[in-house]
């Protein structure tokens, strides 16, 4: 079943010059297509919409601060089982626990600065795509 998902290449991926490598890995996998790509710096409103469910948790403020620290690359990726697949390609949130061959396993350093965000379900993908690409949903 074809799906769409949101992928964010976080400020650490942009700062470290890894966006091209990560995008190449996504494009090479399973015939997925990148149908939208945008470089942007996230404002407070967008970050609150995206991470609002975590407000009040100890990691919320540092996460929002990190995500506002530099530009991100936002992508819409489409293809068969793309939601599950991109998350597998990214690897676990903690780069130390991520296997070699995954994006975080190969390039990740710490949990908060873990290079990539990918929607975790069809519902999340739909909600997140409306935030980042409102004209494409």
Swiss-Prot record:
It catalyses: a 2'-deoxyribonucleoside 5'-diphosphate + ATP = a 2'-deoxyribonucleoside 5'-triphosphate + ADP; a ribonucleoside 5'-diphosphate + ATP = a ribonucleoside 5'-triphosphate + ADP. GO terms for cellular component: cytoplasm. This is Nucleoside diphosphate kinase. Its cofactor is Mg(2+). It comes from the Bacteria. Its main location: cytoplasm. The lineage of its organism: Bacteria, Bacillati, Actinomycetota, Actinomycetes, Kitasatosporales. Pfam families: NDK. GO terms for molecular function: ATP binding; metal ion binding; nucleoside diphosphate kinase activity. PROSITE patterns: NDPK, NDPK_LIKE. ATP binds at residues 10, 59, 87, 93, 104, 114. The gene is ndk. One of its GO terms (biological process) is CTP biosynthetic process. Major role in the synthesis of nucleoside triphosphates other than ATP. The ATP gamma phosphate is transferred to the NDP beta phosphate via a ping-pong mechanism, using a phosphorylated active-site intermediate. The active site is at residue 117. It comes from Streptomyces avermitilis (strain ATCC 31267 / DSM 46492 / JCM 5070 / NBRC 14893 / NCIMB 12804 / NRRL 8165 / MA-4680). Homotetramer. It is found in: Cytoplasm.
């Amino acid at each position: 079943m074809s799906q769409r998902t949101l992928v964010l290449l976080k400020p650490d991926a942009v700062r470290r010059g890894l966006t091209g490598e990560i995008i190449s890995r996504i494009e090479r996998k399973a015939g997925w297509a990148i149908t939208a790509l945008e470089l942007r710096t996230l404002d407070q409103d967008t970050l609150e919409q995206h991470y609002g469910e975590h407000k009040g948790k100890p990691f919320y403020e540092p996460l929002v601060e990190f995500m506002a620290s530099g530009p991100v690359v936002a992508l819409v990726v489409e293809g068969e089982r793309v939601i599950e697949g991109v998350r597998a390609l990214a690897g676990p949130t903690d780069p130390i626990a991520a296997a070699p061959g995954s994006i975080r396993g190969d390039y990740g350093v710490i949990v908060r600065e873990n290079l990539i965000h990918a929607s975790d379900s069809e519902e999340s993908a739909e909600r997140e795509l409306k935030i980042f690409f409102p004209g494409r949903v």
